[in-house]
């Protein structure tokens, strides 16, 4: 399911076509494992160079979770009408229930999040409190902004807040872990290390292959 959504998103973005290589398929397997295993950390960090599929993958994950949630609703309706699940369906249903209570993921760039903190506090708070949030392009935003003369750190504050509640968060970034530590500090780096599973995107940019 995830691979299908990823292929569609690649085609929609006109990024040179889907590269069906081992590196891409390995990442798809790792992310599928994060989605299906109950033993993984609640959040996910997708990091690596520019233009190698991180944002596209984040959108594919969001589409996959939407589909899983819709499937969970259909199963609930079937059970209400007396349908008995097969052993295979019961196993799948455990996965569906994991995401069945989550709303559609909110997807926002880190730069937009920083802008909201300064110009639209109400929306900023709502986004920060979302049950499932995808922050795209961490590191492209100003680390701190001034709101009525008060200096705030919008993305750092969101990461702290979501760490405290262990809310599901996906972050994409061109920064490596050392860069994250240097830019945001050790406390943010430690929280990401503790609460996020990490998947590196190491291929060259797809944008140069058009």
What are these regions (language model features)?
Residues 56-70, 85-92:
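P-loop NTPase Walker A phosphate-binding motif
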Residues 41-58:
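Walker A/P-loop nucleotide-binding motif
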Residues 69-80:
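Internal, charge-rich low-complexity segments
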Residues 82-87, 94-163:
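Conserved nucleotide-sensing/catalytic segment adjacent to the nucleotide-binding pocket
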Residues 1-40, 198-199, 203-210:
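A short, basic N-terminal segment
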Residues 43-45, 132, 168-170:
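Residue-level preference for the first positions of well-ordered beta-strands
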């Amino acid at each position: 399911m995830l691979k299908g959504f990823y292929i569609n998103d690649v085609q929609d973005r006109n990024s040179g076509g889907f590269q069906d290589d081992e590196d891409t398929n390995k990442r798809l397997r790792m992310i599928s494992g994060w989605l299906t295993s109950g033993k993984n950390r609640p959040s996910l960090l997708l990091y690596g160079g520019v233009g190698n599929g991180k944002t596209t993958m984040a959108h594919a994950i969001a589409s996959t979770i939407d589909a899983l949630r819709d499937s969970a609703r259909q199963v609930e309706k079937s059970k209400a009408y007396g349908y008995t699940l097969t052993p295979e369906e019961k196993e799948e249903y455990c996965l569906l229930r994991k995401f069945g209570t989550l709303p559609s993921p909110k997807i926002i760039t880190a730069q937009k999040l920083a802008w909201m903190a300064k110009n639209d506090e109400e929306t900023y708070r709502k986004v920060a409190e979302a049950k499932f949030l995808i922050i795209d392009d961490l590191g492209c935003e100003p680390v701190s902004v001034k709101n009525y003369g008060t200096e705030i750190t919008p993305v750092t504050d969101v990461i702290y807040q979501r760490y405290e509640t262990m809310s599901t968060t996906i972050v994409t970034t061109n920064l490596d872990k050392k860069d994250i530590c240097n830019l945001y500090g050790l406390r943010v780096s430690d929280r990401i290390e503790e609460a996020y599973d990490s998947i590196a995107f190491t291929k060259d940019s797809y944008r140069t292959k058009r």
